Structures are given as structure tokens and as C-alpha cells.
Amino acid sequence: MKFSSSILASALLFSASCSSAVAFSTHQRLVSLRTTFVSSTFLASTAEKESECSTAESTTTTISPEFEAARDQAIATLKAQLPPGTESKLEAPLAHFISEYFQSLSDAAASGAKNPDGSSITPQQAVKNMLTSLSYALKFGMGEGKFIFENVRHRAMRGADFNDTTTDARYEDEALKEKLGPDVTTDFYAAGCDFFRPSMDLEHSIVSGQDNLKKAMEQIEAGENVVFLANHQSEADPQVVSCLFETIGKEAGDFAAHVTYVAGHKVTTDALAVPFSMGRNLLCIHSKKHIDADPETKPAKSRQNMSAMNSMLGGLKEGGMAIWVAPSGGRDRRDVESGKIPIAPFDQKTVDMFRLMGNKSKKPTHFYPMAMVSYDLCPPPDFVEAGVGEKRNVRFTPIGIAICDEVPNIGGAEKRHLFTEKAEAECIQGYTELLKGLKMEKYIPEEYSS
């Protein structure tokens, strides 16, 4: 089931005060609804909808009464404001997303998980995070004020007041300031991390290969380039990288914020994904599947990809560029029969292209396979969907990253397949070890154990 523009429009009503006839700004709407949550009682439907999700095992934990009340208030507010006759069509996707998120934070609170400042995870935090996410999606993901990723290489929107080593001249542009409005100072990178971090069981998560990460950071510091060849498991993988690197230390956390992610069309067009993408350094590249899906737009998409390649080459020539790319071109999908989750195969041509760009840059470019375990955090659909707006699932779960040994960028064209095979094998090995360490052996494909 997909999120359409009309479905996202209901978020406006969800983030507005029930009794107000005044047109509020996004932030005013949030303040109004938060106040309403505290001061009013809503008649929420007590019937739980049967989950339509076929992407992961059903949540078996029980939501706490406090989180349940906050969730029901949120869903009731949404339902009460939907146009007559549209409830059944519009309510389910957003209600499912809300339910999933509140359940995950309830599980986090029950486990004793804490926020980075040591505070407890609360229903109020779930309300604030969800309302903020939906309001950003409404404001920047659709309609006249939709944020347009005008450049194939997007730089993270960290806010006009962000204290970095350089000044972001974009915030001097009057048109951008007008579009962002009160959010001109919003750090969308931090907002994305704040949304997903409570759903990550960081205490029981794993970051292995930290010596390799340290080496990669030193190479970046020396003006060289690093490419992480990763498997891809969830929409929240950029936040997974950031939040796990933060657990290592400030230096690693700062490094995560500077990584550039190679992204497909969905992250810049799906209304709920747009605000999270605004906070990331991106290279927007259409996958081969997406290019071939529509013959009429194929030439334009191919030109955009060429522009992205040229932009990436420019960054590599400058040096000090860290890139995260999933050579498979998409997320890992579970085997619906066995329940195992194999890594999607690395695409030879994709790996070749990044090696070529590294060589053409005339700067030393280093390649590190990166294994990721994040499937349970935001389980993807079991089958690839061409459109945007997939159903969102969220779980409280441990996650893991393994930075594997560097694969030397050597060898001619006749042996290029050996490089890809080596990188994929390293990723599979790291992935298998992570699953064992996280006590998720049930996901290990039989062929990985041989």
C-alpha cells in the first residue's frame, strides 16, 4: 500500500488543533497539537487493525498503557479530521506508521534504553518526533512548498546557525530562506537521527572493524578518498551509520555526518522520505531498473546520471570525499519461504564505475566493504516496488555495522570481476559474523554457513 499525496495531506489535519479556525504555521500547528494532547481526551477507536504488513514477523510485545494512550490519541485525531467518506482509504497507512513507531518506542522504554543525554524514552518524545516528521513531510514533501533537489549532488541542510568550519552560502539565498521559513535554522541531519535513534537498541548493537574505520578516517584527513561498498537493508541506513558511529566517539560521529550517500529517485520524491534526505549529503543516481521502467524518460534520466557522475568525479578530484554506495542497487530482501535474509548481489558494472571514477580522480581512492544489519529496524517490502510511498514498518532492535578490510584497487579490466567478488565476499563474511554476534542466526542463509 502506498502513501499518496492525498494521504500525506491528512497529516496537515493531524498536526493542527481540533478546535482552531486559524491557519497556523507548521511550528504553531505542532505546539497546538502537543498542547491538545496534554489537555484533552479523545474518543479513540479501541479496535486494532489487522496488520497488512507482509514484510516481517509481527510484533509480539505489548505496548505500555502510556504509549498506547498517546498512540490512540494521535490516531483518533487523524481519523476525526479526515474528510467524510475517505476514512478507510486515508487512515490505514498513517495509522500503521504511527502504531509501528509508538510500539517501537514503547519497547525501547520497557527495555530500559535511554536517550544520549541519559533521559528516559517517553510517550511525549514519541509524539514530538512523529508530529515533527509528519509536519516536515507535509511542508517539504508535497504541494507548492515541496523541496526540490535541484542538484544531482545535494549537500545536507544543517541550518543557518549550524556551527561548522565553513559558512553555508545557500542560507544567504532569499528564495531558500522564504521556502524554509521558520525551519531555516533546522538541522535536518540531527532531526533524522533524533527520529530513528530511540528505535535502535544501541546498547546491544555492534560496530566491528573499528581499526579499519580509523584507517579510513585518516585517509580522508590526508585528502584521499574512501568508498564504502555496502549492503543495504533499510530506509534508515544513513541514520544507522550515524548513530552507530556516534557510539564510538565524537570524531567518528562527525565523520558520519560528512559521508555522501548514493541514492535513488525514491529518497528525493517520496513525501515522507524527503525531509530525511534533506539532511544528508547525496548523489542522486537513477538505478538501471528505474531508468528502464519508462522508455520516454530514459534519455533524461541517463543525462541526469551522467551529470551525477561528473559531479562525483569533481568531488573525488578535490579529495577527502567519503562515499557510501550499495552496489546491489537496492535493499536486501528476505526469502519469504525460509525467512533468511541474503545480501543482494553486488552489480559488477556499478563497482567498475566507482573504481574508474577513483582512478580518473588522480587521488588515492580506497574501497572498504561495509556489512550492515538493520533489516528489523525498518523492514522493507518483500518485493521491489517501482513507485514511491511504501508502507512503513519500525521495530526496536539491535543493529550492526562491520567495516571490512580494504580491498586494493588494483588489477586490469580482465580481472575486474575478482575485485567485485572479493568485496562481496568480505561483506558477506562481515554480515554473517554480525548476525551471529547479534544473536540473529535465524537470518543467515544456509549457503553462508558452508
Regions found by a protein language model. Give the residues of each.
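Non-catalytic C-terminal accessory region of glycerolipid acyltransferases
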Residues: 63-79, 89-90, 298-450
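Active-site cradle of extracellular carbohydrate-active enzymes
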Residues: 259-315
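Gly/Ser/Thr-rich loops at beta-strand to alpha-helix junctions
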Residues: 231-237, 267, 330-333
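Basic/hydrophobic alpha-helical interface regions
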Residues: 250, 257-260
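N-terminal mitochondrial targeting presequences
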Residues: 23, 37-50, 58
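Membrane-anchoring hydrophobic helices of lipid-metabolizing enzymes
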Residues: 61-226, 232-246, 256, 281
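N-terminal chloroplast transit peptides
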Residues: 1-32
